[in-house]
Amino acid sequence: MNEEEGPRGISLRAMIPNAITTLALCMGLTGVSLGVRGEWERALGAIILAGVLDGLDGRIARLLRAQSKFGAELDSLSDNIAFGTAPALILFLWSLQMAPRFGWIAALALAVCCALRLARFNALIDAAEQPHKSAGFNTGVPAPAGAGLAFIPIYLWLVTGNDHFRAWQPVMAWTLFIAALMISSLPTYSWSSIRIRRDWRLFALAGIALLGASLIVTPWITLLFLAGLYLLMIPLAFASYQRVMRRRGAARARGQ
């Protein structure tokens, strides 16, 4: 019997991370409901909140020592809905439904590629040979980041009020591009591998505080900035990964 389970059932400590994951799932579905009603800002806010909760559940599970196979499966299913299905439907309702034939196909591509990315992650989680992970990188764009990037046209529309950003042609092309990034084999930075120098800690904390304030005061400009920064980091991550692999190759050559 699992140590978290006794004759009286499962402990509250074991349920907390799963409750957070379930709440993230609810936020994703709520985003779709808000999108159906045309409440675009609130719809995006629900998906963003789902992303925050998704970032917390695993860390809280490790902190409480409450990791479980059930929690991992629930997290994957929640991510698929909150960052694949829900963003695809929101983009379709906001713009892609105006495409004569291919708008729904683009929305499907985003949802399906998110599912495929998560399936690949689950299939490789126990694999012995994972070059990207061993070097501190993700493989492809993670699902929450992919959802945030897919919403860039909506950020631009909310910031500028320009309906050109809502035209289905560029939105469809952008949606397909993000779908491809999610299932790509490109190395991308993993937050768990980022280390901050001791003498930069206070600056980092101040930056996080300012970022939080910016998200409250000017959320769409801030999210647009963060999404653009993430896009710029993709080629940097690729170059950094190549350097790591070259150093490893040189070290193996010296060892021989």
State what each model feature region is:
Residues L29-V32, L49, L53, P87, ...:
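Alpha-helical transmembrane segments of polytopic integral membrane proteins
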Residues I10-N18, F70-S78, N138-T139, S190-W200:
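Short, amphipathic, aromatic/basic-enriched membrane-interface segments that mark the entry/exit
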Residues M1-E5, A135-Q256:
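C-terminal membrane-associated helical module and adjoining short loops/tails
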Residues R59-S68, A115-K133, I183-S192, A239-Q242:
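C-terminal ends of transmembrane helices
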Residues M1-G55, A237, Q256:
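Topogenic membrane-insertion module of multi-pass membrane proteins
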Residues C26-T30, A86-A88, L205-A213:
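Hydrophobic, membrane-inserted alpha-helices
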Residues A14-T21, L63-F121, P153-I154:
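Multi-pass membrane catalytic core of lipid/isoprenoid biosynthesis enzymes
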